[in-house]
Amino acid sequence: MAYTQTATSSALLETIRGNNTLVNDLAKRRLYDTAVDEFNARDRRPKVNFSKVVSEEQTLIATKAYPEFQITFYNTQNAVHSLAGGLRSLELEYLMMQIPYGSLTYDIGGNFASHLFKGRAYVHCCMPNLDVRDIMRHEGQKDSIELYLSRLERGNKHVPNFQKEAFDRYAEMPNEVVCHDTFQTCGHSQECYTGRVYAIALHSIYDIPADEFGAALLRKNVHVCYAAFHFSENLLLEDSHVNLDEINACFQRDGDRLTFSFASESTLNYSHSYSNILKYVCKTYFPASNREVYMKEFLVTRVNTWFCKFSRIDTFLLYKGVAHKGVDSEQFYKAMEDAWHYKKTLAMCNSERILLEDSSSVNYWFPKMRDMVIVPLFDISLETSKRTRKEVLVLKDFVYTVLNHIRTYQAKALTYSNVLSFVESIRSRVIINGVTARSEWDVDKSLLQSLSMTFFLHIKLAVLKDDLLISKFALGPKTVSQHVWDEISLAFGNAFPSIKERLINRKLIKITENALEIRVPDLYVTFHDRLVSEYKMSVDMPVLDIRKKMEETEEMYNALSELSVLKNSDKFDVDVFSQMCQSLEVDPMTAAKVIVAVMSNESGLTLTFEQPTEANVALALQDSEKASDGALVVTSRDVEEPSIKGSMARGELQLAGLSGDVPESSYTRSEEIESLEQFHMATASSLIHKQMCSIVYTGPLKVQQMKNFIDSLVASLSAAVSNLVKILKDTAAIDLETRQKFGVLDVASKRWLVKPSAKNHAWGVVETHARKYHVALLEHDEFGIITCDNWRRVAVSPESVVYSDMAKLRTLRRLLKDGEPHVSSAKVVLVDGVPGCGKTKEILSRVNFEEDLILVPGRQAAEMIRRRANASGIIVATKDNVRTVDSFLMNYGKGARCQFKRLFIDEGLMLHTGCVNFLVEMSLSDIAYVYGDTQQIPYINRVTGFPYPAHFAKLEVDEVETRRTTLRCPADVTHFLNQRYEGHVMCTSSEKKSVSQEMVSGAASINPVSKPLKGKILTFTQSDKEALLSRGYTDVHTVHEVQGETYADVSLVRLTPTPVSIIARDSPHVLVSLSRHTKSLKYYTVVMDPLVSIIRDLERVSSYLLDMYKVDAGTQXQLQVDSVFKNFNLFVATPKTGDISDMQFYYDKCLPGNSTLLNNYDAVTMKLTDISLNVKDCILDMSKSVAAPKDAKPTLIPMVRTAAEMPRQTGLLENLVAMIKRNFNSPELSGVVDIENTASLVVDKFFDSYLLKEKRKPNKNFSLFSRESLNRWIAKQEQVTIGQLADFDFVDLPAVDQYRHMIKAQPKQKLDLSIQTEYPALQTIVYHSKKINAIFGPLFSELTRQLLDSIDSSRFLFFTRKTPAQIEDFFGDLDSHVPMDVLELDVSKYDKSQNEFHCAVEYEIWRRLGLEDFLAEVWKQGHRKTTLKDYTAGIKTCLWYQRKSGDVTTFIGNTVIIASCLASMLPMEKLIKGAFCGDDSLLYFPKGCEYPDIQQAANLMWNFEAKLFKKQYGYFCGRYVIHHDRGCIVYYDPLKLISKLGAKHIKDWDHLEEFRRSLCNVAESLNNCAYYTQLDDAVGEVHKTAPPGSFVYKSLVKYLSDKVLFRSLFLDGSSC
């Protein structure tokens, strides 16, 4: 052991001494590698050739000053000021290094030849000829270019490639390369450039006035300007000559003229303004506009050249804190008292920020001046007695050392000689340990005598002042002043005989008869002080004139003093009062006196309230005998009508509206609307009606239909106005690039806060500065909408493009008599014809254009009829006898003819029945022919919440004629028509096979280049139409828009992969789409749907059978199971039998083909192959496109083959695909919805349907915020979550509209066959930070608890943390003897379909439960326009609304939305049982209940792609609910259980055991086999191919209950 320790110590000592050869070799190798790396790095620097002859010292100067370049000194060119000229090239390259390559750059006064030689084709040089020298310099640059080109030509060489673009640009467009205008007036255009713009100024800013520099940069949209200029700190002293030793140049100053020249050279001098240069040095901010400013920042000083940059700053982006709108009256009065003091100080304020205010900045940017002070030196001529003064920079430490020492001298020792001796001694040497080492202070020896005199004089005067302060007395016959002069004369001897006169002239002393006052001057000033004084002497400091403002403030102060006598005057809103006086141009004192008179009841006007609260104002302004000012009142009937002139004089305008019986107090007198101008500036509130659903119509059916039509117009207008008002209230400054269907114009800035997709809107809603809302008829000029001074914002929407509803209401109002419409006695004949039966042809053959009228719904159809009628060349069909319905209603009475003999209405069944009745009445005809198709698209009520009863949809006619022979449709389509119409449908077409379909791989594959479409292009939805138009297709329409049209060839396109309710086998839209063509129709779709099935069926019909159209329908029967026992479930233990093959067989029978998929490498394939994606606006960080590789750990291999996938690795592509297929794939199906009013009605139904009657009102004594609620929330959180809140101070709210985005690594298995044709997207999670959850989590937890406590739990189950046993108890009292309909609402894209309407419904529910208004508004804004950031994948995007899958209200919010949706559509008062959970629902209704069109209601109101299924057994949250005669049992879905057994993410055997236990818990009910037969029936309802499955249920129980046996379902992946 001792030997080992000795050997180790010896080796260590050898290593330390450097005798270890191995260590030495390693060290040398390491040193060599480091040197190689360093030299390689240096070799990569930009190369600069220095051709001018310079000395070795100058070579070292250039190399040290610019280490960024690899400089090669050739010394081949003699020139004047060689170093400065060579450095200029380095300075230019250094400036250009700061600019991104290729960005448009302005070189102010630059050398365009240098840029051409470097190949910079993106630089424009502004080279004005300010003097003769500039012309000479420019010609020299041109000569250098000619010389270069001649050399190339002489050597038969071409311009190098890197220079070619620049030289071509100079040859073709020299004005793009260089101009001779000043930078302020440069006319260079930037039309084709969209990036950031830069500028450089190399020794050229001297000639640009500093006050114009910022504006000039902004004019060119410059982002950053880099500048370089010569300067010296000594220029700020009183010296008139300053040397720049490094470049052998000098500055000479004469007043404001500053001259620059090179020493010992005959070159011309450069002359500039000293004060202008001083501004560039001292100022920090250079204003460019009232919003933007350029901020200067010094970069570096190199070889007497100063580098800086000017950055563009938008001051509107400064953080301004939280806006405070309240008014503190005490502070206002106090401010008024101090007004004159403020006036005095504000007048002296400087509007510029200069670096002089910060001494640390001065020291930093003038590093040589850090420890220097400026000391004055004096000299006097003996001949002329003229004093001269100059200043020098001296180290502060040197000055204090001298002063502190000589201050200790006794009076006899304080002589000039002693001071000079001491100064010379400390300047000459420093003694260290008795040895002379060096001089500590480097002070010029030529200054020592003058400095010594200054120090001596200062101390002498300071001593005299101290003595005079101690005592004032006379000494003998001489006064104190005489003694002082004696002392001074003795000190200076005869050298300065006139020192007394000099001191008096210098104002250092003040003498009277017997007294002497001495003012000791400052020995020195700091560099900072001199810089400040010099700048203020050279620059006129701006003064702020606030006299006018102070006068206005004085007037306002007097007015407020007048108002102070009012009661509660401290709550008076001063801001609103001031704005009112300014907008109305009213004197504040006059307005104040009027207000005092009104409030004191001295004006003749009596107000019924003491305080102007909202309730009191509403009470005072309620309708009595007069309408409010500007009101457009909706009335049900006329009363005694006064004259229209009197109504207009009062600013009233009444509109015939909801015609049903409602309380009479809701309405006022009704006037006739004579022109559209009466709508202008009517108050928006008068057009918004909230009682659409409580209407009772009276009279004959036709009269009721006509009243309903008028009311529908009012409801449509009300919804449009209401939504526009809501938009104005909700809109803040939104991203200007965002385009929406609606638009909001900011009047002050003339910019769209939200850009609308349409233009030239006819009307809109205006928000005034007084926050009032009015409907305005808009006018336009070349600049846009013409606005008024008191308008603040204008909102428009697609409904406001034309005057349609307004003009129709005006016309129909004139037709009413005593509030009742008149019904025509004309005969009405309905011509019911199949598609293509020749309805239009028949109309043209029967019509007499001279006395008849043709009306059609659309403009295209009207043009087609005119074109066909005038085909012979004789014009018979005009705009007077062939018109659209809208045109006829809007312009009634304006044409030449008002009465017609016969009326022909084409596609009349697409119109409101009341509209048809009005058309018959208005035409004054004897007979009316209404052509239509009872099976095609009927009238669709697009105003959600407005009642359109089913019996109103039936048109009352006198006679019905049928047309069952189609002249258009081919034979295969006729075969389909026979399934839809009564009677035999025949065709005349020779075409037999005309329809076909093509499945496309995705929406992105349909574009005009790769997929040109034949014939007319049709879509089912507006979103698909807009998508095709945006990709370049033309003449695209929806099926609804072309009803009644005929085309030879049709291409029908569906791009929406999610379910669309109107695409169904019995849908009228499908019928219309199949019957538009005469030759061919091809259907392009991205998914399988009913239309594909229809087309495939038609393709299989035999040609010889196409004339046989009979279809037999089978009878549906339902098996009834009688009851045996009651009250509890019969239990029969499940035998444990079966094998793995049983589970595999059952899975393959239910989902054939899924188990054969080899999808382990689908994710890899997607990453490695080319992929084309259509995305919405988002920001992608492409550095995250390749995920960091991770070691793949082996997982267990399942023996059961299912469609389960391997866990995927998150990354840019994977996350983006998930975002596209989920967040970016939201449907747009909803119609016109009056959001606020409809939401209020829906919530009324929610509370009436689900809540106990005694708990429908919120508990006011209930506190949402309490320690208990917070503790309950914390108890549910993990420890990691609590740790994230450690640094949260809860002082302010975090950004509630900011969300993070992530995906689940494991794809969700679908129990269908979609996995065989598509790559399933991962589930996305959009979530808040824990800080936000800590605020809103306890809040919504308490609200949820309060809601669940109020639910009628005997009838409704809100599935929140319920066990299967509790579900069984809930459904256990169902009586199987009572016939029931089991309903399930299946909603596709549930989260992503939720829009503004869903948010309004949910917020209204929370509000009624007691949510505080402020937090409710915060939560609302946090779910309106939101920003998503995925830091893992590098994705950032913006979403409007949508349900966030990770915030605190995700689950309960989805639950209340699905419950609200069903309550608004189904008769919940008849419901037996109902359960809701997220997007799942299960409802039990009595057999035979009538249900509305759920698909249409879900589409138009809720934007849901929904289907309502009637079943025998319920399916709820992955479980089958089996009700029987004893009660109810809940079975977990066995197919879902088998799918989970194919999981490929099990890590190890311990993970497998946890997996088994979780499956045992959810599948516990399978241990009871008593109701396996009913379970088979329930599974068979969902999966049609499922066999009886008791054998597989037993097998599942067998493997799940045995830990060892369950391990046999998996293999160890590490051993495979």
UniProtKB/Swiss-Prot annotation:
MF terms in GO: ATP binding; ATP hydrolysis activity; mRNA methyltransferase activity; RNA binding; RNA helicase activity; RNA-directed RNA polymerase activity
Keyword annotations from UniProtKB, A to Z: ATP-binding, Helicase, Host-virus interaction, Hydrolase, Inhibition of host innate immune response by virus, Nucleotide-binding, Nucleotidyltransferase, RNA suppression of termination, RNA-directed RNA polymerase, Suppressor of RNA silencing, Transferase, Viral immunoevasion, Viral RNA replication
Residue ranges, annotated region (Helicase): 830-1085
Pfam families: RdRP_2, Viral_helicase1, Vmethyltransf
Coiled coil start-end: none
The EC number(s) this enzyme carries: 2.1.1.-, 2.7.7.-, 2.7.7.48, 3.6.4.13
All copies of domain (+)RNA virus helicase ATP-binding, residue ranges: 801-963
Protein family according to the UniProt entry: Belongs to the ssRNA positive-strand viruses RNA-directed RNA polymerase family.
Name by which UniProt lists this protein: Replicase large subunit
The species this protein was found in: Tomato mosaic virus (strain S-1)
